Swiss-Prot record:
Pfam families per the UniProt record, alphabetical: ABC_tran
Location in the cell: Plastid, Chloroplast
Role: Part of the ABC transporter complex involved in sulfate/thiosulfate import. Responsible for energy coupling to the transport system.
Keyword check for ATP-binding: yes
SUPFAM superfamilies: P-loop containing nucleoside triphosphate hydrolases
Protein name: Sulfate/thiosulfate import ATP-binding protein CysA
Matches recorded under CDD domains: ABC_CysA_sulfate_importer
Positions annotated to bind ATP: G35, P36, S37, G38, S39, G40, K41, S42
Catalysed conversion reaction: sulfate(out) + ATP + H2O = sulfate(in) + ADP + phosphate + H(+); thiosulfate(out) + ATP + H2O = thiosulfate(in) + ADP + phosphate + H(+)
Keyword terms, alphabetized: ATP-binding, Chloroplast, Nucleotide-binding, Plastid, Sulfate transport, Translocase, Transport
GO cellular component: ATP-binding cassette (ABC) transporter complex; chloroplast
Ranges of residues in domain ABC transporter: 3-233
Amino acid sequence: MSILIDNISKKFGNFQALNHINLEIKSGSIIALLGPSGSGKSTLLRIIAGLDTPDEGTIWISGKNASGYSIQSRNIGFVFQNYALFKNMTVYDNIAFGLELRRISFNDISRKVNKLLELVQLQNLGHRYPAQLSGGQRQRIALARALAIEPKVLLLDEPFGALDARVRKNLRAWLRDLHNKFSITTIIVTHDQQEAMEIADEIVVFNSGRIEQIGKPQDIYDQPATPFVFSLLGYVNKISFDNEIANFLLSSFPEKQSVLMQEKQFYIRPHQIVISKQSNESNYSAKIENLLYIGNWIHLDIYVASFNVNLKVHVSPKEFDNLQLKSFQENIYVSLRSKGKEPIRFLE
């Protein structure tokens, strides 16, 4: 089921939650609405579901104006962050709830619920109550309940936000596999950029009720359209052209790459910076001020005294070990990766 969001606006009092939003969601795709709290993501999700009404604009579902559609007739499954399971019902009864409202036969309900329990890998827990389940299990039950009515669209509002990191990672992979099996048009709201990158076919970046950028995860990361998008997706070094280091860094790029000198700042990712123990004409001395091990890479805060500038640098453990530093007081030398992409510059 395709969804067209046509010039949607919404205010709550004086707060502009959504400001002329236009977005097309293809049938069978999985889209992440990414942005900070209060940026309008959940408001848009509720408008699509029919839980809220826009002040302006139209939602089109499969080419039809959904303005007059009831919540039930939209055939949309909705999963909230807090699961919204019925505490006094068993897992089985929670999943069966929507089917019973549709007056489906007992045998068909039993068959479908058992099939869904197997799908979410909880086939032996149908007799338990929500309080007897872990957070990850409760979220899978909430998803099973949403899928029971065979929705054409699945809406997920921060579905993994209340779970610990390991469970979130496992559920992200599980959700992606689930989507590949059923190809239900899915919209997930998240403020977690890693979650959006792992799950979505496309990411829609929200900021203050507006869309900043729409694109595939890798395109959003490699070619951010605005400083906000660049900063939202990972660490960034923001460097002013007023600092002499700008000329040094920009001179590292091939001449064929354009430089828009009227712009006042440019942005560069920490992994685009190289550090070494060897001095040469294309690098400058620096010192490490802080080090943080983060899984399979190391985050360094370095200070380049010649330019009075602090930089964030990301290197692999092997690259760091090759430096053979005895202390942080030793000089290191900074340059750019020769095959790295041009830093993205913005007018501000």
